[in-house]
């Protein structure tokens, strides 16, 4: 899973608008310096109080926007697509571009697939001839089959001495329905801090690695303590998370 080209914007306007109900704009102390936002003590304190007061009081969170390019397997995108409100996504199309390049093992998420070097007796299928067949073998054969159909789609197929039309839809269907859900797709995604808080609350301990990686990416965003607080973490847990992020950045 990859996160690229992360951009966060809207802090200054959102935190100024946060003060509209009480008309306390004179206390607004958030500034932009060299393209970076520095939230002042007054604004940060009010934001934290509004977050603790509940979602109906923290509307400013919906006005802080995040744009990012995410590469992840289709099985994760299927779950991500349940978040319809407050998200926009443009994806690389498997419908239109599935035959654009040859399929390779690197195009799939395979970190948990068992291979012959590490499987026990009950983790592979054995053919009558004695050949052992692991999940990784199955994916490799599927990739070979996908590339075979891709070649037929691009170059056409001879049938009864005649060249069947190239880019035939029947051939295209073979690739579409054979494509495993571990295939990685890239999307440009637009979210906001309120959506991220809801995701963080429900997914931070999810059994899918991709959701936990997503939540770690959230923790690295500017002023992510606002998201984590809205997501249900207490101050001690937030400080521990932020400390881990700072330590990681020092190592990098």
Please provide the spans of the model-predicted regions.
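Family-specific signature for flavin-dependent thymidylate synthase
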Residues: 1-252
